[in-house]
C-alpha cells in the first residue's frame, strides 16, 4: 500500500478526494508534515446545498492545520473548486474535513474544544502551538452554534452569583437553571449587579421564556441583585443562598472574636476554630479551644453556637 493511501485512510477521505503527495519539513521546529489533497482531473463535486454532483471550475488553494502526526505538526492543503448547480447557482464546495471559513480541520477543533473545557485558552494555545486569538474564534463559533439550540421555555427557577475573573475588580455573573442536574449553566455575562439581571431577562425572552413564568430565584444578599430580581421577575420568590447566609454569620462571629480578644485572652486555636463548622475536621488545639469557649462565658462561644444553630434551616 502506498504511503499516500495510508494517509488517506487515516484522514477518512472518500472519493473524489485522495492524498496526492506528502512532505516532511525537518528544517522547522517542530517538524511539519504537509499533505496535499486533491482529485483526478475531471472529477465532479457535490453542490453544498443539495448534494448534486456538478462539474468543477475556479479552483482556489487553502491550507488547514490538522492534528499532529506523532510529534509533528500536520497541515492539509487542497485546491477547492466552485461548482455550478442548475438549481442553486455557482458556489464554493464544502470540504468534508473542515467547516467553511476555518483554518483548522474539524478534528483539530474538536480537540481544542475538549481542552478549552479543562484549562485556560492561553494554555491550550501554547499546548497546540497557535495563538489564543485564533482559538477564541473557534470557541466563539461553537458556543454561538450551541446557543442557537438552547430552549428555555420551561425555565421556572434560576440561581445567580458573581465571581472574579481577572485581577482589577473584573467580574462575571453566572446564571444556572435550578432544575437541571446536568450542565445547569444557561447564561454568563461580564460585570455584576442590576444590569446583568436585565441582560439575562432579555436572553431568556429570546429563548422562549416569559419572565413571569419564573417562580423562584436564588441569590446572595446583594442589594442590586435583589432590586433587579424584584423589577424584572415580579412573580418570583427570592431565596437567599445558604452559602452566603453562613458566610455572613461567619464574618459576624469573627468580628465578635476580634472585639473580645481586645478585652480578654482567648484560648489558643480560637481564630481558625470558630471559622469552621462543628462537623468540619479540626486540629486538637482548635477542638479544645471550642470546648473551652462553649463551657465558659465567652461571647465568641455564644456567637459560634448561634451560627451553628443555622444548620436546622438547611435540614
Residue ranges and their predicted role:
Residues 1, 23-27, 90-92, 100-315:
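Catalytic center-proximal scaffold of phosphoryl-transfer enzymes
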Residues 1-90:
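Short, conserved DNA-binding cores of transcription-related domains
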Residues 57-65, 95-103, 244:
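Short cysteine/histidine-rich zinc-coordinating motifs and their immediately flanking basic loops
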Amino acid at each position: 500500500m502506498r504511503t499516500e493511501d495510508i494517509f488517506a485512510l487515516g484522514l477518512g477521505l472518500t472519493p473524489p478526494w485522495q492524498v496526492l503527495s506528502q512532505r516532511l519539513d525537518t528544517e522547522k521546529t517542530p517538524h511539519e508534515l504537509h499533505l496535499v489533497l486533491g482529485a483526478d482531473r475531471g472529477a465532479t463535486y457535490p453542490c453544498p446545498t443539495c448534494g448534486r454532483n456538478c462539474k468543477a471550475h475556479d479552483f482556489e488553494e487553502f491550507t488547514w492545520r490538522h492534528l499532529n502526526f506523532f510529534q509533528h505538526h500536520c497541515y492539509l492543503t487542497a485546491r477547492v473548486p466552485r461548482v455550478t448547480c442548475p438549481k442553486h447557482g455557482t458556489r464554493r464546495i464544502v470540504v468534508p474535513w473542515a467547516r467553511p471559513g476555518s483554518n483548522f480541520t474539524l478534528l483539530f477543533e474538536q480537540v481544542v474544544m475538549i481542552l478549552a473545557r479543562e484549562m485556560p485558552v492561553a494554555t491550550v494555545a501554547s499546548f497546540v502551538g497557535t495563538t489564543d486569538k485564533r482559538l477564541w474564534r473557534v470557541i466563539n463559533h461553537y458556543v454561538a452554534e450551541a446557543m442557537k439550540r438552547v430552549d428555555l421555555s420551561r425555565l421556572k427557577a434560576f440561581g445567580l452569583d458573581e465571581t472574579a475573573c481577572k485581577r482589577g475588580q473584573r467580574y462575571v455573573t453566572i446564571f444556572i437553571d435550578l432544575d437541571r442536574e446536568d450542565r445547569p449553566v444557561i447564561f454568563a455575562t461580564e460585570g455584576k449587579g442590576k444590569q446583568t439581571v436585565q441582560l439575562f431577562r432579555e436572553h431568556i425572552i429570546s429563548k422562549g421564556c416569559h419572565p413571569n413564568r419564573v417562580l423562584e430565584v436564588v441569590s446572595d444578599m446583594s442589594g442590586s441583585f435583589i432590586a433587579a430580581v424584584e423589577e424584572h421577575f415580579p412573580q418570583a420568590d427570592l431565596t437567599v443562598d445558604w452559602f452566603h447566609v453562613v458566610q455572613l454569620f461567619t464574618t459576624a462571629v469573627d468580628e465578635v472574636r476580634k472585639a473580645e480578644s481586645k478585652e480578654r485572652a482567648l484560648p489558643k486555636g480560637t481564630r481558625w476554630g470558630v471559622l469552621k463548622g462543628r462537623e468540619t475536621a479540626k486540629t486538637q488545639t482548635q477542638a479544645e479551644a471550642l470546648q473551652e469557649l462553649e463551657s465558659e462565658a465567652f461571647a465568641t462561644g455564644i456567637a459560634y453556637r448561634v451560627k451553628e444553630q443555622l444548620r436546622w434551616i438547611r435540614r
